[in-house]
């Protein structure tokens, strides 16, 4: 029988280039757990060599095969047994295995896995707005099987494919195919289907060289986000009265559709998908997460009331997909074809292989409804080769899995018509109106305009959000002040905008959790993206978390916002309450302030007493309370210092323009720099780049430096494109930048 042996203990990690001393580690492990998010501006991208010994497992009968299974190695790996290469693998997010039987010897065997998170010419991701952690961050197993066994070689797959389909009479057919290695005429495959309660409801037997079958189950219980009923399909490789190998798959019976006007429906019921995106890292663990970490994340998302998760921007752990199956989430699973397109045959082969691994390894998960083929890939521009690659990926998805829909996440400046549309079954945009530029109120009109111009496209929003840092607070929140209040205000608008538009097939907040991004330095916090609804340590649910809980959660809830804005000045202060109940009553120090009937967001003007005040909100059977202190002057530490500095810098920038008419048509004289030049081109001239870098910093709070941070992702962009992405510059700003650049000769 199959035996799976964990090899997570007792590894030695050394660095051949000598960046760090050798150490003993336990898997899951990453060498970037700290420097990948500590804000020092860079992190170790190198090769690490993991090594340990093992004893060859022995099957009861003669023979048998031994495999090493690597659950993920970031970003590429070479596996050796006793000094001989067993396999190599490019791609940091998928399972891969190697048959090492013939490399093993009696007694101790040495297993070494060389792992690198350095960039390579053909591998994705090339550059992106998150840390590329290095290491064996999911674990390693030995798998011992008889000579005849269910397949372990094909793209890291599970050896079985199950396609449940509901039937008109309330039953379901389970189309099953398993893959047997080294079968002979004496073997059969026995299938058993167990219902969500563990009772066998159907079975069948097939010859081992022709395993495909369709099994009917009456009165099938459907899988949905509200009722995630799971069936278990067990496959046993049988000879006489002995089971030689056994595998299983947890699956769900469901059907779903997406239409441009009706949005998403599951099992015939209209159900707008409203949820979040998620990265796989945690404070000072990096991406080396345990099973408990994955399930904790899924439980917090369930607490939010979300029914969908976009798993960005790569294949996630089987543990998390399992959690989504069990808890009921509609999952968007994608490959790291992101930001920067790499030209050439090798890069094309690599991205196709990543899609094959994603689909083959995850085909049985009922939670996965959408395969995502790329994210913001036009950041570096468009080419026919890029478009053709998308068509190739779409074709591949349909060949491997005709049962699911495909999707894409367009960068904001992707034209609303053109060759990138109508490739995938459904589409989404990443938009940040109200954060990187523009106004929150632009979001709704943009959605309506796109829908009117493209009535045949199923439209979703795959990313939207803004940073919220729980140190910063404001009574008058503004874009780019990084306050918890502005983040909540932003999401109040967005939650309502999507509720008003059920035809938006899915919306995904960017992001559920703050996450590591070593290149970032924003809002006084370095090394992280702080757009999460929950902090990176999972300790604090920001006020914006409760905005969505009020809109999405089914259980009664009430939450008083602003509890970290604990010291308030003024005769009165605004107190916001979020609730999914119709009516909220607020009390201050036991006295009723008022009762309001509203939709999700309740606002009260409260006259605080001197000193400390206890506020309590009551909504039907639920209540919440906070304590506020009335003070003469609110602490200066509530305001991000650089917010005022940047506002002053923008004002000074315009003063330098004098009386120039910034409404006049822009000019682009030949032989001079302009906003049409890429950052890479502008960097060739010290003066031109200094002007551009200052403009970008003032308008977006991004520091751009050649060779540092997100330079690889941004270098092909022009200031003109950046401005067009999301109205990124203040009015007149791009014109003033161009006016300065056209004075600088190339």
Write out the residue ranges for each language-model feature:
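Accessory beta-strand-rich segments of carbohydrate-active enzymes
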Residues: 3-17, 40-41, 45-153, 183, ...
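An acidic-aromatic loop/edge-strand motif
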Residues: 7-9, 15, 26-40, 100-172, ...
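Extended substrate-binding grooves/exosites of carbohydrate-active enzymes
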Residues: 27-38, 84, 118, 123, ...
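Extracellular ectodomain segments of secreted/surface proteins
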Residues: 46-58, 154-170, 549-573, 642-643, ...
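Structural beta-strand segments of beta-rich domains
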Residues: 64-66, 170-176, 571-575
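Extended acidic/polar, glycine-enriched regions
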Residues: 102-108, 177-259, 611-612
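Compositionally biased low-complexity segments at domain edges in trafficked proteins
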Residues: 145-149, 153-169, 264-284, 640-672, ...
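Compact, charge-rich alpha-helical regulatory domains located at protein termini
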Residues: 662-734, 738, 745
């Amino acid at each position: 029988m199959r035996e799976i042996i964990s090899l997570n203990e007792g590894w030695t990690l050394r660095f051949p280039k000598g960046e760090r001393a050798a150490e003993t580690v336990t898997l899951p492990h990453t060498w970037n757990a700290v420097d990948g998010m500590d804000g020092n501006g860079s992190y170790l991208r190198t090769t690490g060599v993991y090594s340990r010994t093992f004893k060859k497992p022995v099957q009861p009968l003669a023979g048998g095969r031994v495999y090493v299974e690597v659950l993920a190695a970031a970003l590429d790996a070479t596996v050796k047994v006793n000094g001989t290469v067993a396999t190599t693998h490019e791609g940091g997010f998928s399972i891969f295995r190697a048959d090492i039987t013939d490399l093993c010897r009696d007694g101790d065997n040495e297993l070494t896995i060389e792992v690198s998170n350095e960039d390579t010419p053909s591998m994705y991701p090339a550059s992106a707005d998150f840390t590329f952690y290095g290491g064996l961050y999911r674990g390693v197993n030995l798998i011992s099987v008889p000579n005849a066994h269910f397949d372990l070689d094909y793209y890291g797959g599970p050896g079985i494919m199950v396609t449940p389909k509901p039937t008109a009479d309330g039953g379901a057919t389970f189309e099953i195919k398993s893959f047997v290695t080294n079968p002979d005429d004496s073997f059969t495959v026995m299938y058993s289907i167990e219902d969500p309660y563990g009772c066998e409801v159907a079975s069948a037997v097939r010859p081992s060289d022709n395993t495909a079958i369709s099994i009917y189950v009456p009165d099938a219980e459907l899988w949905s986000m509200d009722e995630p009923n799971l069936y278990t399909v067990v496959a046993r490789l049988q000879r006489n009265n002995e089971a030689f190998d056994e595998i299983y798959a947890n699956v769900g019976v469901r059907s779903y559709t997406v239409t441009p006007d009706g949005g998403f429906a599951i099992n015939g019921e209209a159900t707008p998908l409203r949820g979040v995106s998620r990265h796989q890292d945690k404070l000072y663990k990096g991406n080396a997460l345990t099973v408990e970490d994955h399930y904790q994340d899924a439980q917090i998302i369930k607490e939010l009331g979300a029914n969908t998760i976009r798993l960005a921007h790569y294949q996630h752990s089987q543990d998390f997909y399992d959690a989504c199956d069990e808890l009921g989430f509609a999952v968007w699973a994608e490959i790291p074809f992101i930001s920067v397109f790499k030209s050439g045959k090798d890069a094309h082969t690599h991205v196709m292989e990543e899609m094959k691994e994603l689909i083959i390894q995850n085909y049985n998960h009922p939670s996965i409804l959408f395969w995502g083929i790329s994210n913001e890939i036009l950041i570096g521009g468009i080419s026919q080769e890029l478009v053709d690659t998308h068509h190739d990926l779409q074709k591949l998805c349909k060949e491997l899995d005709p049962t699911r829909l495909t999707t894409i996440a367009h960068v904001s400046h992707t034209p609303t018509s053109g060759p990138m549309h109508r490739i995938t079954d459904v589409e989404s945009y990443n938009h940040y109106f109200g954060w990187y530029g523009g106004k929150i109120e632009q979001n709704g009109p943009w959605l309506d305009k796109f829908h009117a111009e493209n009535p045949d496209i199923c439209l979703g929003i795959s990313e939207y959000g803004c940073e919220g840092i729980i140190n910063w607070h404001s009574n008058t929140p503004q874009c780019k002040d990084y306050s918890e209040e502005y983040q909540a205000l932003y999401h109040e608008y967005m939650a309502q905008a999507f509720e008003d538009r059920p035809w938006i097939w899915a919306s995904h907040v960017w992001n559920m959790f703050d996450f590591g991004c070593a290149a970032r330095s924003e809002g006084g916090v370095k090394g992280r993206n702080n757009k999460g609804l929950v902090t990176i340590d999972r300790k604090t649910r920001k006020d914006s978390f409760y905005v969505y809980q009020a809109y999405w959660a089914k259980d009664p809830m009430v939450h008083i916002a602003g509890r970290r804005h604990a010291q308030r000045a003024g005769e009165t202060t605004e107190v916001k309450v979020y609730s999914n109940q119709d009516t909220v009553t607020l009390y201050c120090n036991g006295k009723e302030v008022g009762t309001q009937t509203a939709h999700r967001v309740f606002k009260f003007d409260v006259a605080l007493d001197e000193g400390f005040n206890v506020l309590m909100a009551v909504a039907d059977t639920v209540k919440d309370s906070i304590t506020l202190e009335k003070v003469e002057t609110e602490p200066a530490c509530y305001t991000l210092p650089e917010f005022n500095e940047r506002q002053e810098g923008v004002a000074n920038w315009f003063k330098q323009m004098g009386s120039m008419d910034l409404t006049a048509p822009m000019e682009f004289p030949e032989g001079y720099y302009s906003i049409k030049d890429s950052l890479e081109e502008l960097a060739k001239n010290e003066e031109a780049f200094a002007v551009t870098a200052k403009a970008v910093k003032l308008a977006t709070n991004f520091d751009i430096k050649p060779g540092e941070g997100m330079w690889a992702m941004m270098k092909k962009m022009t200031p003109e494109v950046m401005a067009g992405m999301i109205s990124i510059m203040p009015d007149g700003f791009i014109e003033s930048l161009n006016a300065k650049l056209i004075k600088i000769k190339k």
